[in-house]
């Protein structure tokens, strides 16, 4: 029997609709939620991501500004722009699109964003707060994954969860959110000897590596929930995830597709973080 799909597009639409209502209420009070997106350079993928984020804002009643800069922008100039955005009362969230050109220190730039406007959740203050269970903002992709699990009313308390991938953006915060929900969590990284030995016992698998067909049917327990964060291209140039979708869907209980799974949820949770920042600022 095939796994049930967790439809990220449908869930994102529902959450965005609710966010638009909250945004309209704030706007009526003179506090329209505002997101500033900063793009440095001409990376094609980054341009697509940025365009999608700006459109999502505009479609749901948010104010958005897009600052595009050439790849030779100096680090000092970028930091000065972030400082100006930190002090702009119409901007509640600041997002610097990664990757940045090599001559710019990404860590320094992310740390320059005011924690109360760090809607990506990457600032060390927010990362630390996530560890203690009281974050201002949850990183958007893990937050979206948790919403997907919530949408199927999955009982995480006591469940065995395996996160494949240990990045600061997805893997580590994902593990923390699962831990806080009561799951017993294992993180697999590039040094893990036998990933399948861990995933075969898992009730929930989150694959976030960026390697096509990393998770195959023989690595999945029947009935498990499989969340695919990966974004890759197959031999025909079609988008695919880290999971062998055709094979794994015959074993899993629930599975997210690529595209149409985690991707739409990431941008949706960016809107939610921006909305919450605006609500806090409005009082």
From Swiss-Prot:
Spell out the reaction equation it catalyses.
(6R)-5,10-methylene-5,6,7,8-tetrahydrofolate + NADP(+) = (6R)-5,10-methenyltetrahydrofolate + NADPH; (6R)-5,10-methenyltetrahydrofolate + H2O = (6R)-10-formyltetrahydrofolate + H(+)
The record's function comment reads: Catalyzes the oxidation of 5,10-methylenetetrahydrofolate to 5,10-methenyltetrahydrofolate and then the hydrolysis of 5,10-methenyltetrahydrofolate to 10-formyltetrahydrofolate.
Q: In which pathway does it act?
A: One-carbon metabolism; tetrahydrofolate interconversion
Q: Which domain of life is it from?
A: Bacteria
Query: What's a BP term from Gene Ontology annotated to this protein?
Result: tetrahydrofolate interconversion
Q: Name one Pfam family in it.
A: THF_DHG_CYH_C
For this UniProt entry, what's an example GO CC term?
Answer: cytosol
Family annotation (InterPro entries): Aminoacid_DH-like_N_sf, NAD(P)-bd_dom_sf, THF_DH/CycHdrlase, THF_DH/CycHdrlase_cat_dom, THF_DH/CycHdrlase_CS, THF_DH/CycHdrlase_NAD-bd_dom
The GO molecular function terms of this record are: methenyltetrahydrofolate cyclohydrolase activity; methylenetetrahydrofolate dehydrogenase (NADP+) activity
Q: What is its EC number?
A: 1.5.1.5, 3.5.4.9
Give the keywords, sorted. Answer: Amino-acid biosynthesis, Histidine biosynthesis, Hydrolase, Methionine biosynthesis, Multifunctional enzyme, NADP, One-carbon metabolism, Oxidoreductase, Purine biosynthesis
Task: Note the CDD domains from the entry.
Answer: NAD_bind_m-THF_DH_Cyclohyd
The family line of this record is: Belongs to the tetrahydrofolate dehydrogenase/cyclohydrolase family.
Quick one: which gene encodes this? folD
**Signal peptide (UniProt feature, chain positions):** none
Indicate what this protein is called per its UniProt record: Bifunctional protein FolD
Q: Which annotated residues bind NADP(+)?
A: 165-167, 190
Subunit composition and interactions: Homodimer.
């Amino acid at each position: 029997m095939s796994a049930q799909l967790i439809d990220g597009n449908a869930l994102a639409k529902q959450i965005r609709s609710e966010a638009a209502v909250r945004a309209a209420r704030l706007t009526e009070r003179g506090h329209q939620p505002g997101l500033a997106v900063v793009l440095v350079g001409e990376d094609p993928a980054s341009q697509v991501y940025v365009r999608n984020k700006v459109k999502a804002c505009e479609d749901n009643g948010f104010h958005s500004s897009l600052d595009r800069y050439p790849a030779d922008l100096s680090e000092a100039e970028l930091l000065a722009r972030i400082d100006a955005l930190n002090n702009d009362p119409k901007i509640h969230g600041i997002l610097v699109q990664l990757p940045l050109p090599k001559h710019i220190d990404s860590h320094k730039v992310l740390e320059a964003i005011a924690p109360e406007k760090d809607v990506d959740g990457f600032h060390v203050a927010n990362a630390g707060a996530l560890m203690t269970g009281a974050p201002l903002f949850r990183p958007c992709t893990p937050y979206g994954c948790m919403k997907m699990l919530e949408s199927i009313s999955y009982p995480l308390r006591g469940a065995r969860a395996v996160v494949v991938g240990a990045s600061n953006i997805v893997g580590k915060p994902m593990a923390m959110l699962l831990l806080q929900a009561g799951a017993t969590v294992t993180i697999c990284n590039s040094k893990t000897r036998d990933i399948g030995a861990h995933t075969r016992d898992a009730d929930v698998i989150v694959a976030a590596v960026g390697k096509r067909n990393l998770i195959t049917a023989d690595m999945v327990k029947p009935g498990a929930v499989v969340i695919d964060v990966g974004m890759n291209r197959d031999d025909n140039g079609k988008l695919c995830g880290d999971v062998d979708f055709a094979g794994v869907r015959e074993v899993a209980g629930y599975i997210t597709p690529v595209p149409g799974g985690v991707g739409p949820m990431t941008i949706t949770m960016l809107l939610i973080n921006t909305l919450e920042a605006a609500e806090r600022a409005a009082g």
